[in-house]
Amino acid sequence: MAKKENRVIITLECTEARKEGASPSRYTTTKNKKNQTERLVLKKYNPSLKKHTLHKEIK
């Protein structure tokens, strides 16, 4: 029987773009759900705002 995978694909969405009415940028990445149980927050580049902003994991 195959083992259950620990890595899952997640989507990161910009938090500041919604406040300003711009289209939110989204990034796709993977995370290990055994080591990182809480939601991931990274600082990534948003091309519509032309600056680095916080991106939070969405479902």
UniProtKB/Swiss-Prot annotation:
Any one annotated GO CC term: cytoplasm
> Sorted alphabetically, which Gene3D superfamilies does this protein's record hold?
Ribosomal protein L33 (2.20.28.120)
A Pfam family the protein falls into: Ribosomal_L33
Q: Which GO terms describe its biological process?
A: translation
Q: Which UniProt keywords apply?
A: Ribonucleoprotein, Ribosomal protein
The superkingdom of the source organism is Bacteria
- Give GO MF terms, alphabetically: structural constituent of ribosome
Task: Name the NCBIfam families on file.
Answer: PRK00504.1, PRK00595.1, rpmG_bact
Family assignment from sequence similarity: Belongs to the bacterial ribosomal protein bL33 family.
Record-given protein name: Large ribosomal subunit protein bL33
Q: Which organism is it from?
A: Prosthecochloris aestuarii (strain DSM 271 / SK 413)
